[in-house]
Regions:
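Aromatic/acidic polysaccharide-binding cleft in carbohydrate-active enzymes
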Residues: 102-108, 114-175
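Conserved, mostly hydrophobic/aromatic
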Residues: 11, 21, 48, 108, ...
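A structural motif corresponding to the C-terminal end of an alpha-helix
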Residues: 10-18, 96-97, 133-136, 187
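Carbohydrate-interacting/catalytic domains
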Residues: 33, 41-42, 60-66, 81-95, ...
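Acidic (Asp/Glu)-rich catalytic clusters
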Residues: 12-13, 89-103
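The substrate-binding groove and active-site-proximal loops of carbohydrate-active enzymes
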Residues: 1-2, 16-26, 70-78, 107-120, ...
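Active-site neighborhood of glycoside hydrolase catalytic domains
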Residues: 1-60
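Structural preference for beta-strand elements that scaffold enzyme active sites
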Residues: 16-20, 45-49, 68-70, 100-103, ...
Length: 268
């Protein structure tokens, strides 16, 4: 254990402050509890991310023994009900007190069916959901940015996996998401309402393929509303019920809506 601890300290000395731990549930729980506590004595700012896609009870225990952040089932939550139910579980139950989710649409090991068959729109959908539902999110970089969706037939694995071959990525490939991802990340950085997971509220929309939710800063100074079309194959439309009463806006009062993705502004 001491030798393994020395490895972590070596990388901390090189400036590393975030450790993604692969499959921590396959190692003894007492080891992780001891190691994380030892590291935090000197470096309380170090983050340990649990990369464990396993049973809920095991994922929760890893969070309780010290992992700051955890992988989740977001990767496989695609419908309106699936996403809503899961977010309520994460943000409105006792799990909120110890489990900090980190949303990943894909990983080097996992290419979910939604991305395999939904084309570029599916990648856009999952990116926006991950970036706006959770304060913490990540992507397996070039494969996601270039919308790579070729899978091993019948499996959720990349057909030509970077794990087994050296890739020469064409970052300017047609259809890439570079600028879109940069825009979304800029919006997250500039808007404090998106920098926490616990302020999430779902709102009414009359279409099962549209997900409508919002986040607000604690002081009420900023409100972000997000609408996502969960259907990667078709354009969808619907009527939203804007919660103007929460924002102190009277029904007969016009207000400014700023579309942060397009930078367009509207008077509603």
């Amino acid at each position: 254990w001491e030798e393994l601890k020395s490895v972590v300290f070596f990388w901390i000395d090189q400036g590393i402050r975030i450790f993604r731990v692969d499959n921590p549930h396959t190692k003894p729980f007492p080891f992780w509890e001891w190691l994380i506590a030892e590291i935090r004595k000197d470096y309380p700012e170090v983050i340990f991310l649990s990369e464990a896609f396993t049973r809920p009870k095991v994922m929760k225990r890893l969070a309780k023994i010290g992992f700051n952040q955890s992988y989740t089932y977001f990767t496989w939550r695609n419908s309106k009900k699936e996403i809503t139910d899961y977010m309520i579980e994460l943000t409105q139950t006792e799990q909120k007190e110890y489990f900090r989710p980190n949303f990943w649409p894909n990983t080097p090991d996992i290419l979910p069916e939604f991305l395999q068959f939904g084309g570029r729109p599916a990648f856009v959908i999952k990116l926006v959901l991950a970036a706006t539902l959770s304060s913490n999110y990540g992507i397996y970089g070039p494969a996601f940015e270039l919308c790579v969706n070729e899978a091993v037939p019948g499996k959720e694995e990349y057909l030509n996996s970077e794990k087994y071959e050296i890739k020469q990525w064409n970052w300017d490939q047609s259809g890439n998401l570079k600028q879109f991802i940069a825009r979304v990340n800029r919006i997250r950085r500039e808007n404090p309402a998106l920098q926490t997971t616990w302020n999430l509220k779902f709102y009414e929309v009359d279409n099962e393929y549209l997900l409508f939710y919002g986040k607000e800063t604690a002081d009420g100074a900023e409100s972000i509303l997000t609408v996502v079309n969960l259907d990667p194959y078709h354009t969808q439309s619907g009527w939203l019920k804007i919660p103007i009463y929460e924002f102190g806006i009277s029904p007969d009062q016009p207000y400014l809506c700023h579309d942060l993705l397009s930078d367009d502004k509207y008077i509603w």
